[in-house]
Structure formats: C-alpha cells, structure tokens
C-alpha cells in the first residue's frame, strides 16, 4: 500500500465536502493509501485545524486519523534539516524519510528545495496531482 505524508495545509483544504480535493480524504478513509504521521505532525494538525476551523472538528479529524487502520505512525530519530526557509516543514520531511514514504503531498513552495537534494531523495507532489491518483 502507498505511504504518503500530508502537510497541514493540504489536510485543511481536503476536508470540506465541496472541496475538489475531498477525494484525498475519502481515499484515506477507504484505505487507498496509508497516511504517515509523527507526534509533531499530529500536534500541528490539531493546532492549525483548531485555529482555521474549530477545536471540535480538529479533535474529530485527528481522532479519525489516529484510530484508522490506514495510519503509519513513526518517531523520526534523526533531524535532517533539509528545509531552511521554514524549519517547521522539516517535521514532514523527517517523517517521510523515516517511514520511506512514496511522497509528501504539499502545495508549499518551501518543499521545492527537495527536488535539488539527491540524498536523501524525497518526492513532493501537489495536492491536485495526488488527488488525480486517488480516482
């Protein structure tokens, strides 16, 4: 099964039922891929979803993720520090490397630097491209 890492903004935009990216959330729920997360990522998901939507929905979304059998939980023991423009984004990179994820799904421009780093290789897909693979 595919293992992917999803950045927080992509999680946020895929949740509404009218979102063109809702297919990404639905694909996770039916087991089309495994969502790979770390403690740091879960904390960020909860924080940002609470601020942007509301705390109750944030708790429900995170609880759904954590209780899913399609979850890959990892504790990255090494911090690669590959993204320097927004060091908070490194939590997603470290998770992807530690679990051997197929890709990070992100629309964040800070992740583009990863294309120029040969090792460790980390593939990044924007959410539209990833959504097209979920059909």
Feature locations, PLM:
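Acidic catalytic patch
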Residues: 62-83
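Metal-dependent nucleic-acid phosphoesterase active-site entry motif
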Residues: 1-19
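Conserved glycosyltransferase catalytic-site signature
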Residues: 8, 86-90
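A secondary-structure boundary/capping signal
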Residues: 7-8, 37-38, 107, 126
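Alpha-helix capping/helix-boundary segments
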Residues: 11, 41, 110-111
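PIN/NYN-family metal-dependent endoribonuclease catalytic core
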Residues: 6, 20-50
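Acidic, PIN/NYN-like endoribonuclease modules and their adjacent C-terminal/linker elements
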Residues: 82, 90, 102-103, 109-135
């Amino acid at each position: 099964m595919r293992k992917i890492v999803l950045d927080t903004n992509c999680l946020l935009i895929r949740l509404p039922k009218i979102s063109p990216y809702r297919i990404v959330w639905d694909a996770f729920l039916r087991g089309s891929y495994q969502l790979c997360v770390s403690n740091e990522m879960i904390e960020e998901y909860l924080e940002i979803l609470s601020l942007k939507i509301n705390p109750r929905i944030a708790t429900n979304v995170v609880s759904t993720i954590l209780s899913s059998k399609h979850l890959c939980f990892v504790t990255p023991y090494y911090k690669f520090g590959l993204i320097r423009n927004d060091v908070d984004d490194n939590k997603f990179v470290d998770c992807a490397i530690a679990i051997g994820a197929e890709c990070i799904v992100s629309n964040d421009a800070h992740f583009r630097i990863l294309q120029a780093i040969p090792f460790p290789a980390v593939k990044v897909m924007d959410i539209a491209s990833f959504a097209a693979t979920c059909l």
